[in-house]
Design a protein with these regions (language model features):
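Anaerobic metallocofactor- and corrinoid-dependent redox/one-carbon enzyme cores
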Residues: 1-178
Length: 178
């Protein structure tokens, strides 16, 4: 996105999440940024919180995993569906979030709509092009939650975006007693 420093948001956000014991599964532009930053290397476990570091060591995996191009989001939704089936929970109850911190193409919003419609809160680091309509903004960030138990959150400050994502994940973990 020409309005922001390329890859900065992706990398800072991933580092913040793994430092807070949150494994990152990604695709598309964020995967390229992660690879360039070495976050998909097993040695990146040293940037993790103690819990995720232990998981990475036991499973012999890096803390950031790649699942394809941006339009391969269905792979992540299949994973969420399998986690839902195995746990007996609705997808919306799982401690998962979606994020497009530096989205640059309208397809990212279409993909985000899929994630939200699946029941996963989705966080954006760039304003979607709907701010001209307060009604549309309301429906995407609040109103849709009544239908699908998820919505968009928009926060342009990467540090605050990460905090909001972590808070949402922790809220869901607490509700599950984990």
């Amino acid at each position: 996105n020409p309005r922001i420093r390329p890859d900065y948001g992706h990398i800072q956000l991933m580092k913040k999440l793994i430092a807070n014991d949150i494994i990152v599964i990604l695709s598309g532009c964020s995967a390229q940024a992660a690879a360039r930053a070495g976050l998909m290397d097993k040695r990146a476990k040293d940037l993790c919180g103690a819990g995720l570091k232990r998981v990475c060591e036991l499973a012999d995996i890096p803390p950031v995993l790649h699942m394809g191009s941006c339009v391969d989001i269905s792979r992540m939704m299949v994973l969420a569906s399998e986690l839902s089936k195995d746990s007996g929970l609705n997808i919306s109850q799982l401690p998962l979030v979606g994020c497009a911190p530096e989205w640059m193409s309208e397809k990212a919003i279409s993909i985000g709509n899929y994630v939200v419609a699946t029941g996963i809160d989705t966080f954006l680091g760039v304003d979607p092009q709907v701010s001209g309509s307060s009604e549309m903004t309301y429906w995407l960030t609040e109103g849709i939650r009544d239908w699908v138990e998820a919505a968009y959150t928009v926060e342009k400050d990467i540090e605050k975006l990460g905090d909001a994502m972590i808070a949402r994940i922790e809220e869901k973990r607490a509700a599950l007693g984990i």
